[in-house]
Amino acid sequence: MPATFDNLGITFQYPENWQLDEEEMRGGQIAVTVFSPGGAFWSVAVHPASADPARMAQAALDTMRKEYEGLEAEPINETIAGHELIGFNLNFFYLDLTNTAGIRSLRAEGTTYTIFFQAEDHEYGEIGLVFQAMTVSLLRDLGKKK
């Protein structure tokens, strides 16, 4: 049975055995991150509508490039639950393990959202489907709350 996060104007489902962390960032922006028992994580940051989704995705990519030498990034545009997302698929090494991550950003209902997810490649085949389900559950419910 999935757990449900329903706070801060967003709703999404996540596996009940994952750990959830809410944080307030600079400027009153918020982020919610959910961690798997194996260390994979999925995060959503909520920004003002004035934040440009393409710039948010690029800023996240720039931060990752500073952290991980040799990071490979592929631009991606996709539609999920009727929302247009822009971002990047990432591959990089960390502690001698290959990792896959994704950055997605969108503007909806007067707010800009940035979604970030990351897992080691050996678990990504399974965890990637969980990330996808969490993203769909978030985007499906955008605009339903006022």
What are these regions (language model features)?
Residues 4, 17-24, 65-79, 141:
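Short secondary-structure junctions
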Residues 50-63, 125-137:
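Surface-exposed flexible segments
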Residues 30, 112-113:
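Hydrophobic residues embedded in beta-strands of well-ordered beta-sheets
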Residues 48, 92, 118-119:
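Short beta-strand segments enriched in hydrophobic/aromatic residues
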Residues 2-58, 62:
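Secretory pathway targeting signatures of secreted, lumenal, and periplasmic proteins
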Residues 61-110, 132:
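Signature of long, low-cysteine stretches enriched in small and polar/charged residues
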Residues 39-44, 51-52, 96-99, 122-126:
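Short, surface-exposed beta-strand/loop "edge" segments at domain boundaries and coil↔beta transitions
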Residues 18, 114-146:
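Surface-exposed amphipathic alpha-helical segments
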